[in-house]
Structures are given as structure tokens and as C-alpha cells.
Amino acid sequence: RDLTVTGVQTCALPIWLDELGAEKKLEKFRKKRKNFLYPSFNTIAGSGPNGAIIHYRANKKTNRKIKSKDIFLCDSGGQYKYGTTDVTRTICFAKPNNRIKNIFTRVLKGHIAVATAELNKLNTGYKLDKKARHWLNKINLDYGHGTGHGVGYFLNVHEGPQAISKYNNIKLQNGMILSNEPGYYEKNKDRKSVV
């Protein structure tokens, strides 16, 4: 339930905030949850071109206002009494063009492919990663990170040995908890927009 509430609250962040303000507002939302203890990692809140930087961290120098024409990426997590979370949301405040819709749909298909995979057939992170990238690869696109990682409990939010990655052949087993985070990040030449 707390994870669902956090996802909804992320989408409800007002566009008049800047990136640092969005980070603070999201943490304020989380602190109101009964079982919340502290963030599981530093929030990634990237607007426009900053959203195309994998593992971007806003600071006073790079902080941008979230504009209605921008795509906004928010990746955050919390340590709760019952477990650790890692939630990523991409929000397009304006009407997306056909290219953005196409890419978003392909990323979503990759996410669904991982979420619905039969683990007895796709029993390694390598095989799942290939399935996640399939729809982007069909149009010669890819992303430069693993599709998912092990999620710890009060340790590291990125925890192994399990992962969904091109380089991970660890056999997946019952009880292993993994994130499912395919994506696509593109900087254009003028650095004004991001897919």
C-alpha cells in the first residue's frame, strides 16, 4: 500500500516545483506514512535534459524548474519497517509526440515482458534482460544500464548476486527480489528535451 501511495504522490508533484523542491516534497509525503523510516537512496529528480542523465543528482548549480513542456523522471525509494522500496516514474506533463509515445510503449512492453516472464524458462538475469530490451532493440534503441537489480532489506537498495543484466548469469531462485526498470534516455543536440 505504501508503495502505491508513493507512486501516486510522485505523479502528483506540482510542476511549479524545481528538482530539489520535488525531492523535498516527495520525502515529506513519505515521512507521513506510518511505517516509513528513511530514504533508501538519494532521490533522482530530473526535468527535461537532466532526466536523460542516468543516476542524475540535482544540486544548486544544476537544479532546474519543472516545466509543463518537460518530461520529468523521478526515481526514489524508502526504508519501511516491512521492507525497502525503489520506485521510478516518468511523467510527461504536455501531450507527447508520436516518437515519445512509441518509445514509451516499447519500454512499457519490456517492463511487462519481465513482469510476466515464466522464470522456469527465463531463469537468469541475462535472459530476462534480453526480453526487456527486445522492443527497443527492434528499432535500434537500447539503454546503458541493467534492467533490474536485487533489492535488499535495510542494506543496499542495489544488492546481489541477482540482477537483470546483460552480464548476469546467476540463476534466479524463489525469494530473490528484483527491480524491473527498463528505460530509454536520449539527449538531443540542443539539450532542450529528453525522451
At which residue positions do the language-model features occur?
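Single conserved hydrophobic/aromatic residue that forms the stacking wall/gate
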Residues: 1-11, 194
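Short, flexible, glycine/charge-rich loop motifs used to bind or transfer phosphoryl groups or to couple energy/partner
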Residues: 1-3, 33-34, 62, 168
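Hydrophobic, small-residue-rich alpha-helical packing segments that form membrane-like cores
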Residues: 8, 12-139, 144-146, 154-156
